[in-house]
């Protein structure tokens, strides 16, 4: 018999509905079937706007230190960041990605079997550490009425090659799953590189070139098709022909925009998971924001968080446990009896959690 695997998981609810969906996910993990032989130990950690207001730091050093020294993985809830400059504040999720070496943001978007509209089954792989998100901005000229600001957009060969390799690995993995017959949507493996090198020939040109080079790094990638899309054309095609895409790889900003847009293809940001992935650590994170308008009302949709837990478990090698979560969640959504208001229902976070757990144990 295989031994029970202990996972020490850092829980970072952060702000808004993060404080509701992360506890729901904890309950889910605590009640996974014994057959999976997983034991979770949880460490509660601070970050976010609320933490900044209390302590003056959005990401306490203690949080990073405990993640690095005590945790196998982490679950992040949601962050409420101001839209204007606040002295001393910097986004904790962006900082965590850099400090933990989480160079890839992986966001699967998949419609339910039998759902109306065109079938959607794609993954957006977003470079997580560079582009405009290096946050190197400055005011060049500060004369009232004539102010000029500029920002650095950094693209490196190393980071672009790494994210390209991740995209090819995911495409290869998805093809293996399709060949096993467990996917209802069949397509050839394809990596689509997103860029705007017709305008930004140096930065996006380097990203494009590096992603293409990544295919040559492993002979097993040779059977994977590759194409390219200019980012504005990609926006059009994503909404018109989502069934044409498999794995989409993009620089940070483009990937951020495309992945949120892709969520609309399946109905709600509350359904879409993501994982921030590094060489030795994964931090899952639902795509939705902190939703302050519904925070504290008990109606936050935990589905994206549950799927984020499943995605985290996939990257940690626990595919069977992940599959159980995906199946249980999909059944709740397909039946349509227990849905939160964002999906047209009247149920709350706890009711959704109860229904998912009931499916897992049946």
Curated annotation (Swiss-Prot):
Binding of (2R,3S)-homoisocitrate, residues: 81, 97, 107, 126, 133, 196, 198
Pathway: Amino-acid biosynthesis; L-lysine biosynthesis via AAA pathway; L-alpha-aminoadipate from 2-oxoglutarate: step 4/5
Name of the gene: lys12
Phosphoserine, modified sites: 81, 91
Protein keywords: Amino-acid biosynthesis, Cytoplasm, Lysine biosynthesis, Magnesium, Metal-binding, NAD, Oxidoreductase, Phosphoprotein
Single GO BP term: lysine biosynthetic process
Single annotated GO MF: NAD binding
Matches recorded under SMART domains: Iso_dh
Predominant cellular place of this UniProt entry's protein: cytoplasm
UniProt binding sites for NADH: 79-81, 198, 289-293, 301
GO CC annotations, alphabetized: cytoplasm; mitochondrial matrix; mitochondrion
Protein name: Homoisocitrate dehydrogenase
UniProt-annotated binding residues for Mg(2+): 232, 256, 260
Pfam families: Iso_dh (PF00180)
EC class (word): oxidoreductase
EC number: 1.1.1.87
Superkingdom of source: Eukaryota
Family: Belongs to the isocitrate and isopropylmalate dehydrogenases family.
Cofactor note: Binds 1 Mg(2+) ion per subunit.
Location of this chain's protein in the cell: Cytoplasm
InterPro entries: IsoCit/isopropylmalate_DH_CS (IPR019818), IsoPropMal-DH-like_dom (IPR024084)
Chemical reaction(s) catalysed: (2R,3S)-homoisocitrate + NAD(+) = 2-oxoadipate + CO2 + NADH
Protein's organism: Schizosaccharomyces pombe (strain 972 / ATCC 24843)
Cofactor dependence: Mg(2+)
């Amino acid at each position: 018999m295989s031994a029970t695997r202990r996972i020490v998981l850092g829980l970072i609810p952060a702000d808004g509905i993060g404080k509701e969906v992360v506890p729901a996910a904890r309950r889910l993990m605590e009640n996974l079937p014994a057959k999976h032989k997983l034991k979770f130990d949880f460490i509660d950690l601070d970050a976010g706007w609320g933490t900044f207001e209390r302590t003056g730091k959005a990401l306490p050093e203690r949080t990073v230190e405990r993640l690095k020294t005590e945790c196998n993985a982490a679950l992040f809830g949601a962050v409420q960041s101001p839209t204007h400059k606040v002295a001393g504040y910097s986004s904790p999720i962006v900082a965590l990605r850099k400090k933990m070496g989480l160079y890839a943001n992986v966001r699967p978007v998949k419609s339910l079997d039998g759902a109306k509209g065109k079938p959607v089954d794609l993954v957006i792989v977003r470079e997580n550490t560079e582009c405009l998100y290096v946050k190197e901005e400055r005011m060049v000229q500060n004369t009232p009425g004539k102010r000029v600001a500029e920002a650095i957009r950094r693209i490196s060969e190393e980071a672009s090659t790494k994210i390209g390799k991740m995209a090819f690995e995911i495409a290869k993995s998805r093809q293996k799953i399709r060949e096993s017959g467990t996917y209802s949507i069949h397509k050839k493996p394809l990596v689509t590189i997103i860029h705007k090198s017709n305008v930004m020939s140096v930065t996006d040109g380097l990203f494009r070139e590096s992603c293409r080079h990544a295919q040559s790094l492993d002979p097993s990638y040779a059977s994977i098709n590759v194409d390219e899309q200019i980012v504005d054309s990609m926006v059009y095609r994503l909404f018109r022909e989502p069934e044409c895409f498999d794995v989409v790889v993009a620089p940070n900003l483009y990937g951020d925009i495309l992945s949120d847009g892709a969520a609309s293809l399946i109905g709600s940001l509350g359904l879409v998971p993501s994982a921030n992935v590094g060489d030795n650590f994964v931090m899952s994170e639902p795509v939705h924001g902190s939703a302050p308008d519904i925070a504290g009302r008990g109606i936050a949709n935990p589905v994206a968080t549950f799927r984020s837990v499943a995605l985290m478990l996939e990257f940690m090698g626990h595919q069977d446990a992940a599959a159980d979560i995906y199946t249980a969640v999909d059944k709740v959504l397909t039946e349509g009896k227990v849905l939160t208001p964002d999906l047209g229902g009247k149920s709350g976070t706890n009711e959704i959690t109860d229904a998912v757990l009931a499916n897992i144990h049946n």
